[in-house]
Amino acid sequence: MPRIAALPDHLVNQIAAGEVVERPANALKEIVENSIDAGATAVDVELEGGGIRLIRVGDNGGGIHPDDIELALHRHATSKIKTLNDLEHVASMGFRGEGLASIASVSRLTLTSRQEDSSHATQVKAEDGKLSSPTAAAHPVGTTIEAAELFFNTPARRKFLKSENTEYAHCATMLERLALAHPHIAFSLKRDGKQVFKLPAQSLHERIAAIVGDDFQTASLEIDSGNSALRLYGAIAKPTFAKGKTDKQYCFVNHRFVRDKVMLHAVKQAYRDVLHNALTPAFVLFLELPPKAVDVNVHPTKTEIRFRDSRQVHQLVFHTLNKALADTRANLTESVSNAGEVLHDITGVTPAPMPSENDSENLFDSASNHPTGNKPDTRNAFGSSGKTAPMPYQAARAPQQHSLSLRESRAAMDTYAELYKKTDDIDLELSQFEQARFGNMPSETPAHKTDTPLSDGIPSQSELPPLGFAIAQLLGIYILAQAEDSLLLIDMHAAAERVNYEKMKRQRQENGNLQSQHLLIPVTFAASHEECAALADHAETLAGFGLELSDMGGNTLAVRAAPVMLGKSDVVSLARDVLGELAQVGSSQTIASHENRILATMSCHGSIRAGRRLTLPEMNALLRDMENTPRSNQCNHGRPTWVKLTLKELDTLFLRGQ
C-alpha cells in the first residue's frame, strides 16, 4: 500500500472547488456575495460564453487592503469571522474563506481592488493556482474580479457543463435571486457585450415586479407577520396564479436564498385546501431571525440550512399564509349554492335566474331588459361586466326580439335560410342518429312517403358502430351515445387527446415532422431564461414538432408557426409547455427517447376543451375517430376515455324487473 502523504494546496483547492464551484453560476454567486459583504451599492456583471469563457464582476464596495490582496486568494482566509462564536452568529453572506481560492484553482483569475484611502489600485493574477506578484493598477474605489476559462485545467469537469445558453440561464437566475434578496443594491447584467437588464436600487415591491413579473405582482397578496425576533414578509400568489412549475418559488432566510424543506412543507400545507393535482404555488418569502437561530454552515454552497426551532418556523409560515389565503379559496366557485354570490363579488354580475314552468314568456328577453341593445355575452361562464352571465347548468339564452323593417326582416330570413340549409352529409348523419335512437318506430311521415324504403347506406339497429351514435352533450364535458344495448359516456377531452396524440405520432413517423402553418400575426410572450435557452439549443427540434419560434430579445419570444393539427390551441401555452419539456429532457440525444412525452403534451393543447359545445356530427366524428385509433380506451395519462352502462345495469338502477 502506498505511503500516506499530505496533498499539495493546489490539489486541495481543486478538490474543494468540486463542492463550491460546480458550474459558472456557483462561481458568480461566490463573487457577487463578496461584493455584497463589502458594502457595495452597485454590482455590475458581465458574462461571455455563458460564464464559461469569462465572468467579470465589478462593485463599488470598500475594497481590499493592498497588503491583504494576495491573502484573499488563499484557502480559509477571510475577514468575516475570527472565532467559533463568530461562526455561530454569522450575518455575512460568505464566511468560509474558500470561494475565491477554489475559483482561482480552476480558472485564470484577475483580482483588482482599491480602497478609498489608497492612491492607486492593486492587482494580482492567479493561473492554475499560482499567484503573481501584486502590481499597481488603475481602478476606481471598489473591486473587480475576472474569472476566465473556467475549468480550463480540469477537462473532465468541463465536459460535464451544459451548453453556453443553459449555463447562462443558470447564471442569470442566480443573479436574479441575489438581486431579489437585496433590492437596495443596483444590479446590471451584460451577456456577450449586450445589456440584459439594469436594475436600480429600489423598493422590494418594485424589485419583485422586475424579477418575478408584473403578472405575479398583480395576482399576489402581501404578507407581513411575526415580531422583531422572528419575522416573515413578502408576497404569495393567489391560487388562480398556480402553475405546474416551481420556477417562481423563492425562499430567503436572512436575505440568503435557500431550499428549505421546513418552509416548503409549510407553504404546501397552507395551499392544501385551495390547490390540487400537480399545480404549485408561486411565492417570494423573506424570513428574518437571529443568526444564532439558524445554521448556515451545512454545505459549502450555503443553500441548505438548519433551524434551531424548526417547529416555530413551520407554524409561522403556515399560519401566516393560511390566514392570507382564507378569503381566496378557489373552491368557493365550485358550489352551486353560493356560485351567484361569488360571481357577483368577482365581476359585479348577477347570474340570470332559471326560467320557471309558469313563466314561459321569460324564455325570450325583450330589448327593454337590455338597455344597451346587446345580446348577453355567453362566451364564458362569467360573461362581461354589466351583462347577464348564464350559470354552468343553465341553457343558452334565446335570441332577443327586435323590431325590424320589412327589408331587414327579408335579409335576415335569407341569412338564416342559408345558415340552416342541410347538406346530404348532415341528413345522413341525422338519419343514422334517429335510426339508432328510435329504432323502427311508427313513422309520422305523410302517407305518400311511407312506401319509400330506407337507404342502403343507413345501418339498421343491429349494424350500429361499436361506440354507437351521439345523442347529447352533458355539462360541456361528456358525450352521451347510444350503442346497440347500452349507454356510453365519453370524456370528450380525454378522447380527443388520445386521437390527436396518435395522429401526431403517425405523422412524425411517416414525414419526420409535423406539418405547420404560419400565423398571420406572430404571437409574442415574456419568457424565462430557461425557456430562451431551450429555444436557442433546440430550435431545429421545435421545427420538427411544427413550432417556429424566434427570440425577439429582452426575454421575449415570438410564435410564428404552429402545427396544423393544433390550429385552434393556445399557441403561447403550447410553446411554453414544449419548451419546458425540452429544457427538462436536456441534450438533443435524449430528445428522441422522450419524443412521445412531448407529443403527449402537445396533443393535450389541441384537444377539445371542457365547455365547448359540439354539434351531433362533430360528436359522431369523434366517436368514429376513436374507433379507428389504437389505444383509444385510455388518454395519454392513463385515464379511461369512455365508460359503458348496459341496459341491464340501467334496469338495475331503476329497480326494473325486481
UniProtKB/Swiss-Prot annotation:
This protein is involved in the repair of mismatches in DNA. It is required for dam-dependent methyl-directed DNA mismatch repair. May act as a 'molecular matchmaker', a protein that promotes the formation of a stable complex between two or more DNA-binding proteins in an ATP-dependent manner without itself being part of a final effector complex. Residues 114-138, 353-405 are annotated as: Disordered. GO terms for cellular component: mismatch repair complex. It comes from Neisseria gonorrhoeae (strain NCCP11945). This is DNA mismatch repair protein MutL. HAMAP family: DNA_mis_repair. Keywords: DNA damage, DNA repair. InterPro entries: DNA_mismatch_repair_CS, DNA_mismatch_repair_MutL, DNA_mismatch_S5_2-like, HATPase_C_sf, MutL/Mlh/PMS, MutL/Mlh/Pms-like, MutL_C, MutL_C_dimsub. It comes from the Bacteria. GO terms for biological process: mismatch repair.
